[in-house]
Structures are given as structure tokens and as C-alpha cells.
Swiss-Prot record:
Gene Ontology MF terms: neuropeptide hormone activity; neuropeptide Y receptor binding
Secreted in keyword set: yes
SMART domains found in the cross-reference section: PAH
Name of the protein: Pancreatic polypeptide
Gene that encodes it: PPY
Localization: Secreted
Species of provenance: Larus argentatus
Pfam families per record: Hormone_3
Biological-process GO terms, alphabetical: feeding behavior; neuropeptide signaling pathway
Keywords carried by this UniProt record: Amidation, Hormone, Secreted
Amino acid sequence: GPVQPTYPGDDAPVEDLVRFYNDLQQYLNVVTRHRY
């Protein structure tokens, strides 16, 4: 199954935070799609 992205940390660069949230959104989309 999909691997949940790990939070890069509060002191991570903005690019890493943006990438994390994008990955998290895709992860949640995949998880919810498989659930129903």
C-alpha cells in the first residue's frame, strides 16, 4: 500500500514542507479511494 509521508519538521525548508503536504494530499486521496 501507499507509504504515509513523514513530516520533515518545523525547521525544514519551505520547499520540503510544501512537498510534504502535496505528498500527504496524494496519499490521503489514494487511501480514501481504496477504502470505498
